[in-house]
Protein backbone atom coordinates (compact mmCIF):
# COMPACT_ATOMS: atom_id res chain seq x y z
CA UNK A 1 0.00 0.00 0.00
CA UNK A 2 1.50 3.33 -1.07
CA UNK A 3 1.49 6.18 1.44
CA UNK A 4 1.54 9.90 0.95
CA UNK A 5 3.06 11.33 -2.21
CA UNK A 6 5.79 12.83 -0.04
CA UNK A 7 6.71 9.50 1.56
CA UNK A 8 9.81 7.72 0.32
CA UNK A 9 9.68 4.03 -0.37
CA UNK A 10 12.15 2.00 1.65
CA UNK A 11 13.97 -0.70 -0.30
CA UNK A 12 13.95 -4.26 0.89
CA UNK A 13 16.41 -7.04 0.19
CA UNK A 14 14.78 -9.06 -2.55
CA UNK A 15 17.37 -11.65 -3.44
CA UNK A 16 20.97 -12.71 -2.94
CA UNK A 17 21.98 -15.03 -5.75
CA UNK A 18 25.17 -16.87 -4.80
CA UNK A 19 26.57 -17.67 -8.25
CA UNK A 20 29.72 -19.13 -6.66
CA UNK A 21 31.51 -18.80 -3.31
CA UNK A 22 33.22 -15.66 -4.67
CA UNK A 23 30.48 -14.31 -6.96
CA UNK A 24 27.07 -12.98 -5.92
CA UNK A 25 24.27 -10.82 -7.25
CA UNK A 26 22.31 -8.68 -4.78
CA UNK A 27 18.95 -7.20 -5.78
CA UNK A 28 17.25 -4.30 -3.97
CA UNK A 29 13.82 -2.91 -4.77
CA UNK A 30 11.77 -0.80 -4.84
CA UNK A 31 13.77 2.41 -4.94
CA UNK A 32 12.51 5.86 -5.77
CA UNK A 33 13.37 6.98 -9.28
CA UNK A 34 17.05 7.97 -9.50
CA UNK A 35 18.03 6.32 -6.23
CA UNK A 36 19.21 3.20 -8.02
CA UNK A 37 22.14 5.09 -9.53
CA UNK A 38 22.65 7.20 -6.39
CA UNK A 39 23.05 4.20 -4.10
CA UNK A 40 24.60 1.89 -6.68
CA UNK A 41 27.44 4.25 -7.53
CA UNK A 42 28.10 5.12 -3.87
CA UNK A 43 28.28 1.45 -2.85
CA UNK A 44 30.41 0.59 -5.87
CA UNK A 45 32.99 3.26 -5.04
CA UNK A 46 33.14 2.20 -1.38
CA UNK A 47 33.51 -1.46 -2.32
CA UNK A 48 36.40 -0.66 -4.64
CA UNK A 49 38.25 1.74 -2.35
CA UNK A 50 37.45 0.99 1.27
CA UNK A 51 37.23 -2.76 1.87
CA UNK A 52 40.05 -3.98 4.15
CA UNK A 53 42.15 -6.94 3.11
CA UNK A 54 45.64 -8.43 3.07
CA UNK A 55 48.37 -8.39 0.44
CA UNK A 56 52.06 -9.13 -0.10
CA UNK A 57 53.95 -5.84 0.39
CA UNK A 58 57.62 -6.90 0.41
CA UNK A 59 59.66 -9.83 -0.86
CA UNK A 60 63.26 -11.00 -0.62
CA UNK A 61 64.41 -13.62 -3.15
CA UNK A 62 67.74 -15.34 -2.54
CA UNK A 63 70.27 -14.33 -5.17
CA UNK A 64 68.21 -11.39 -6.44
CA UNK A 65 69.33 -7.80 -5.83
CA UNK A 66 66.73 -5.86 -7.84
CA UNK A 67 63.53 -6.37 -9.82
CA UNK A 68 65.19 -5.87 -13.22
CA UNK A 69 67.02 -9.17 -13.12
CA UNK A 70 66.45 -12.85 -13.71
CA UNK A 71 67.27 -16.01 -11.79
CA UNK A 72 68.94 -19.07 -13.23
CA UNK A 73 66.61 -22.04 -13.47
CA UNK A 74 63.46 -19.90 -13.26
CA UNK A 75 61.38 -19.41 -16.40
CA UNK A 76 59.93 -16.01 -15.43
CA UNK A 77 61.94 -12.86 -14.85
CA UNK A 78 61.73 -11.12 -11.47
CA UNK A 79 59.23 -8.50 -12.63
CA UNK A 80 56.82 -11.23 -13.71
CA UNK A 81 57.27 -13.04 -10.39
CA UNK A 82 56.42 -9.82 -8.53
CA UNK A 83 53.26 -9.45 -10.61
CA UNK A 84 52.28 -13.04 -9.78
CA UNK A 85 52.85 -12.45 -6.07
CA UNK A 86 50.24 -9.70 -6.18
CA UNK A 87 47.67 -12.32 -7.16
CA UNK A 88 47.99 -14.32 -3.93
CA UNK A 89 44.73 -14.18 -1.95
CA UNK A 90 45.62 -14.39 1.75
CA UNK A 91 43.75 -13.94 5.03
CA UNK A 92 45.27 -13.07 8.42
CA UNK A 93 43.57 -14.00 11.67
CA UNK A 94 44.43 -11.89 14.70
CA UNK A 95 47.50 -10.25 13.15
CA UNK A 96 48.15 -7.22 10.97
CA UNK A 97 51.52 -8.34 9.62
CA UNK A 98 53.36 -11.66 9.13
CA UNK A 99 56.47 -12.86 7.31
CA UNK A 100 56.11 -16.07 5.30
CA UNK A 101 58.70 -18.23 3.56
CA UNK A 102 58.74 -20.26 0.36
CA UNK A 103 61.41 -22.73 -0.72
CA UNK A 104 61.12 -25.18 -3.61
CA UNK A 105 63.46 -27.09 -5.91
CA UNK A 106 63.14 -29.33 -8.94
CA UNK A 107 61.32 -28.96 -12.23
CA UNK A 108 57.72 -27.72 -12.13
CA UNK A 109 55.47 -24.88 -11.07
CA UNK A 110 55.85 -22.97 -7.82
CA UNK A 111 52.41 -22.14 -6.41
CA UNK A 112 50.96 -20.22 -3.48
CA UNK A 113 50.30 -23.57 -1.83
CA UNK A 114 54.08 -24.03 -1.45
CA UNK A 115 54.24 -21.10 0.99
CA UNK A 116 55.02 -22.13 4.57
CA UNK A 117 52.68 -20.50 7.08
CA UNK A 118 51.08 -20.88 10.49
CA UNK A 119 47.49 -21.35 11.59
CA UNK A 120 46.89 -17.59 11.64
CA UNK A 121 47.34 -17.47 7.86
CA UNK A 122 45.06 -18.89 5.16
CA UNK A 123 46.03 -19.03 1.48
CA UNK A 124 42.69 -18.93 -0.33
CA UNK A 125 44.06 -19.72 -3.81
CA UNK A 126 46.85 -22.28 -3.24
CA UNK A 127 46.79 -23.23 -6.93
CA UNK A 128 47.91 -19.72 -7.99
CA UNK A 129 51.18 -20.02 -9.95
CA UNK A 130 54.08 -17.81 -8.86
CA UNK A 131 56.75 -19.09 -11.28
CA UNK A 132 58.12 -22.22 -12.99
CA UNK A 133 61.41 -24.01 -12.26
CA UNK A 134 63.02 -25.38 -15.43
CA UNK A 135 65.71 -27.78 -14.22
CA UNK A 136 66.23 -30.64 -11.80
CA UNK A 137 68.78 -28.53 -9.91
CA UNK A 138 66.73 -25.34 -10.05
CA UNK A 139 65.75 -23.83 -6.72
CA UNK A 140 64.04 -20.71 -5.44
CA UNK A 141 63.76 -19.38 -1.91
CA UNK A 142 61.98 -16.23 -0.81
CA UNK A 143 60.52 -14.45 2.19
CA UNK A 144 57.24 -12.59 1.88
CA UNK A 145 55.84 -9.86 4.10
CA UNK A 146 52.03 -9.86 4.22
CA UNK A 147 50.22 -6.87 5.74
CA UNK A 148 46.65 -5.84 6.37
CA UNK A 149 45.48 -2.64 4.68
CA UNK A 150 42.80 -0.92 2.66
CA UNK A 151 42.45 0.08 -0.97
CA UNK A 152 45.49 0.38 -3.24
CA UNK A 153 48.86 1.50 -1.90
CA UNK A 154 51.75 1.98 -4.36
CA UNK A 155 55.23 0.98 -3.26
CA UNK A 156 56.33 4.62 -3.52
CA UNK A 157 53.90 5.56 -0.74
CA UNK A 158 55.78 3.28 1.68
CA UNK A 159 59.22 4.70 0.92
CA UNK A 160 60.42 6.80 3.88
CA UNK A 161 63.39 9.05 4.50
CA UNK A 162 65.10 6.29 6.47
CA UNK A 163 64.60 3.85 3.61
CA UNK A 164 68.35 3.88 2.97
CA UNK A 165 68.59 1.35 5.79
CA UNK A 166 66.46 -1.10 3.82
CA UNK A 167 68.65 -4.10 2.88
CA UNK A 168 69.61 -4.50 -0.76
CA UNK A 169 67.39 -7.13 -2.32
CA UNK A 170 64.26 -6.33 -0.31
CA UNK A 171 61.75 -5.49 -3.03
CA UNK A 172 58.63 -3.38 -2.40
CA UNK A 173 55.37 -4.23 -4.18
CA UNK A 174 52.41 -2.10 -5.15
CA UNK A 175 49.69 -3.59 -2.94
CA UNK A 176 46.03 -4.03 -3.80
CA UNK A 177 44.51 -4.82 -0.39
CA UNK A 178 40.92 -4.75 -1.61
CA UNK A 179 39.34 -8.22 -1.81
CA UNK A 180 36.96 -6.97 -4.51
CA UNK A 181 37.91 -8.32 -7.93
CA UNK A 182 34.99 -6.95 -9.92
CA UNK A 183 31.95 -4.82 -9.09
CA UNK A 184 29.22 -3.57 -11.37
CA UNK A 185 25.65 -2.46 -10.89
CA UNK A 186 22.62 -2.21 -13.11
CA UNK A 187 19.41 -0.24 -12.61
CA UNK A 188 16.23 -1.81 -13.94
CA UNK A 189 12.58 -0.80 -13.87
CA UNK A 190 10.45 -1.78 -10.88
CA UNK A 191 6.75 -1.54 -10.13
CA UNK A 192 4.70 -1.17 -6.95
CA UNK A 193 0.93 -1.22 -7.46
CA UNK A 194 0.21 1.55 -9.99
CA UNK A 195 3.65 3.12 -9.88
CA UNK A 196 5.91 2.06 -12.73
CA UNK A 197 8.63 4.70 -12.44
CA UNK A 198 10.61 2.98 -9.69
CA UNK A 199 14.14 1.55 -9.71
CA UNK A 200 15.49 -1.92 -9.04
CA UNK A 201 19.21 -2.04 -8.14
CA UNK A 202 21.19 -5.15 -9.09
CA UNK A 203 24.77 -5.32 -7.78
CA UNK A 204 27.01 -7.93 -9.41
CA UNK A 205 30.21 -8.55 -7.47
CA UNK A 206 33.18 -10.93 -7.37
CA UNK A 207 35.77 -11.19 -4.60
CA UNK A 208 39.11 -13.00 -4.36
CA UNK A 209 37.66 -15.41 -1.80
CA UNK A 210 38.98 -13.70 1.33
CA UNK A 211 35.67 -11.90 1.92
CA UNK A 212 32.15 -13.20 1.38
CA UNK A 213 30.28 -11.04 -1.19
CA UNK A 214 27.25 -10.66 1.09
CA UNK A 215 29.47 -9.48 3.95
CA UNK A 216 31.19 -7.02 1.59
CA UNK A 217 27.83 -5.43 0.72
CA UNK A 218 26.94 -5.20 4.41
CA UNK A 219 30.24 -3.54 5.31
CA UNK A 220 30.06 -1.02 2.47
CA UNK A 221 26.51 -0.03 3.46
CA UNK A 222 27.64 0.42 7.07
CA UNK A 223 30.51 2.68 6.00
CA UNK A 224 28.15 4.78 3.87
CA UNK A 225 25.61 5.12 6.70
CA UNK A 226 28.31 6.15 9.20
CA UNK A 227 29.67 8.81 6.83
CA UNK A 228 26.19 10.27 6.28
CA UNK A 229 25.38 10.51 9.99
CA UNK A 230 27.10 13.91 10.16
CA UNK A 231 24.49 15.36 7.79
CA UNK A 232 21.52 14.26 9.90
CA UNK A 233 21.94 17.09 12.41
CA UNK A 234 23.95 19.97 10.98
CA UNK A 235 23.37 22.16 14.05
CA UNK A 236 25.94 20.30 16.10
CA UNK A 237 29.06 19.46 14.16
CA UNK A 238 31.34 19.33 17.19
CA UNK A 239 32.57 15.98 18.40
CA UNK A 240 31.04 15.31 21.82
CA UNK A 241 33.35 14.29 24.61
CA UNK A 242 33.18 10.61 25.28
CA UNK A 243 32.28 9.68 28.81
CA UNK A 244 34.37 6.89 30.14
CA UNK A 245 31.61 4.43 30.84
CA UNK A 246 32.39 0.80 31.25
CA UNK A 247 30.26 -1.06 28.72
CA UNK A 248 27.83 -3.59 30.11
CA UNK A 249 29.16 -6.22 27.73
CA UNK A 250 32.41 -6.73 25.88
CA UNK A 251 31.83 -5.20 22.40
CA UNK A 252 32.86 -8.47 20.74
CA UNK A 253 29.81 -10.17 22.28
CA UNK A 254 27.53 -7.73 20.43
CA UNK A 255 28.99 -8.58 17.03
CA UNK A 256 27.16 -10.97 14.68
CA UNK A 257 28.42 -14.54 14.43
CA UNK A 258 29.18 -13.82 10.76
CA UNK A 259 32.23 -11.88 12.01
CA UNK A 260 33.71 -15.17 13.21
CA UNK A 261 34.08 -16.17 9.53
CA UNK A 262 33.01 -19.76 10.17
CA UNK A 263 32.49 -22.24 7.37
CA UNK A 264 29.15 -22.01 5.58
CA UNK A 265 27.95 -25.25 7.19
CA UNK A 266 28.70 -24.11 10.73
CA UNK A 267 27.26 -20.63 10.14
CA UNK A 268 24.01 -22.02 8.71
CA UNK A 269 23.61 -24.41 11.65
CA UNK A 270 23.93 -21.53 14.13
CA UNK A 271 21.48 -19.35 12.23
CA UNK A 272 18.97 -22.22 12.20
CA UNK A 273 19.15 -22.21 16.02
CA UNK A 274 18.57 -18.42 16.17
CA UNK A 275 22.16 -17.83 17.29
CA UNK A 276 22.77 -14.43 15.71
CA UNK A 277 25.31 -12.80 18.02
CA UNK A 278 28.57 -14.00 19.55
CA UNK A 279 26.99 -13.37 22.95
CA UNK A 280 24.25 -15.87 22.04
CA UNK A 281 26.85 -18.43 21.03
CA UNK A 282 29.16 -18.34 24.06
CA UNK A 283 26.24 -19.12 26.40
CA UNK A 284 25.62 -22.45 24.68
CA UNK A 285 27.38 -25.56 25.95
CA UNK A 286 29.06 -28.23 23.85
CA UNK A 287 26.22 -30.64 24.59
CA UNK A 288 23.62 -28.11 23.44
CA UNK A 289 25.45 -27.39 20.20
CA UNK A 290 25.92 -31.08 19.38
CA UNK A 291 22.13 -31.44 19.51
CA UNK A 292 21.89 -28.94 16.64
CA UNK A 293 20.92 -30.69 13.38
CA UNK A 294 23.86 -31.14 10.94
CA UNK A 295 26.40 -29.72 13.41
CA UNK A 296 28.99 -32.39 14.16
CA UNK A 297 32.18 -32.62 16.17
CA UNK A 298 34.26 -31.10 13.36
CA UNK A 299 32.07 -27.98 13.30
CA UNK A 300 32.10 -27.86 17.11
CA UNK A 301 35.90 -27.96 17.15
CA UNK A 302 36.00 -25.16 14.58
CA UNK A 303 33.66 -23.00 16.71
CA UNK A 304 35.68 -23.63 19.89
CA UNK A 305 38.98 -22.77 18.16
CA UNK A 306 37.61 -19.53 16.69
CA UNK A 307 36.20 -18.47 20.07
CA UNK A 308 39.45 -19.36 21.83
CA UNK A 309 41.42 -17.15 19.41
CA UNK A 310 39.31 -14.25 20.70
CA UNK A 311 39.64 -15.15 24.37
CA UNK A 312 36.13 -16.65 24.56
CA UNK A 313 34.70 -20.09 25.21
CA UNK A 314 31.44 -21.99 25.27
CA UNK A 315 29.38 -22.24 28.46
CA UNK A 316 29.91 -18.65 29.59
CA UNK A 317 27.28 -16.96 31.78
CA UNK A 318 26.15 -13.47 30.80
CA UNK A 319 23.92 -11.58 33.20
CA UNK A 320 21.16 -9.40 31.67
CA UNK A 321 21.65 -10.82 28.19
CA UNK A 322 20.52 -9.75 25.63
CA UNK A 323 21.12 -6.00 26.03
CA UNK A 324 18.35 -3.60 25.06
CA UNK A 325 20.29 -2.50 21.97
CA UNK A 326 19.73 -5.85 20.28
CA UNK A 327 16.76 -7.23 22.19
CA UNK A 328 14.38 -5.02 20.21
CA UNK A 329 15.75 -6.12 16.83
Curated annotation (Swiss-Prot):
The keyword Mitochondrion does not apply. One of its GO terms (cellular component) is cytoplasm. InterPro entries: DNA-dir_RNA_pol_insert, DNA-dir_RNA_pol_RpoA/D/Rpb3, DNA-dir_RpoA, RBP11-like, RNAP_asu_C, RNApol_insert_sf. It catalyses: RNA(n) + a ribonucleoside 5'-triphosphate = RNA(n+1) + diphosphate. GO terms for biological process: DNA-templated transcription. Disulfide bonds: none annotated. Keywords: DNA-directed RNA polymerase, Nucleotidyltransferase, Transcription, Transferase. Residues 249-329 are annotated as: Alpha C-terminal domain (alpha-CTD). Its EC number is 2.7.7.6. Gene3D superfamilies: 5' to 3' exonuclease, C-terminal subdomain, DNA-directed RNA polymerase, insert domain, RNA polymerase, RBP11-like subunit. It comes from the Bacteria. It is an enzyme of class 2 (transferase). GO terms for molecular function: DNA binding; DNA-directed RNA polymerase activity; protein dimerization activity. Homodimer. The RNAP catalytic core consists of 2 alpha, 1 beta, 1 beta' and 1 omega subunit. When a sigma factor is associated with the core the holoenzyme is formed, which can initiate transcription. DNA-dependent RNA polymerase catalyzes the transcription of DNA into RNA using the four ribonucleoside triphosphates as substrates. The N-terminal domain is essential for RNAP assembly and basal transcription, whereas the C-terminal domain is involved in interaction with transcriptional regulators and with upstream promoter elements. This is DNA-directed RNA polymerase subunit alpha. It comes from Aeromonas hydrophila subsp. hydrophila (strain ATCC 7966 / DSM 30187 / BCRC 13018 / CCUG 14551 / JCM 1027 / KCTC 2358 / NCIMB 9240 / NCTC 8049).
Amino acid sequence: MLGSVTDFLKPRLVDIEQVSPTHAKVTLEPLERGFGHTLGNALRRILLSSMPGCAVTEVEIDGVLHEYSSKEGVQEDILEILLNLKGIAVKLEGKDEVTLSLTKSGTGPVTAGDITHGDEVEIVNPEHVICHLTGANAEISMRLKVQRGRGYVPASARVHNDDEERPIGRLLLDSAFSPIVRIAYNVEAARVEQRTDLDKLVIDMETNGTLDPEEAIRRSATILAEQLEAFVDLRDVSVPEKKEEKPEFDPILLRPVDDLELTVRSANCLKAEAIHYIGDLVQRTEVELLKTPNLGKKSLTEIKDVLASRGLSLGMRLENWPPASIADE
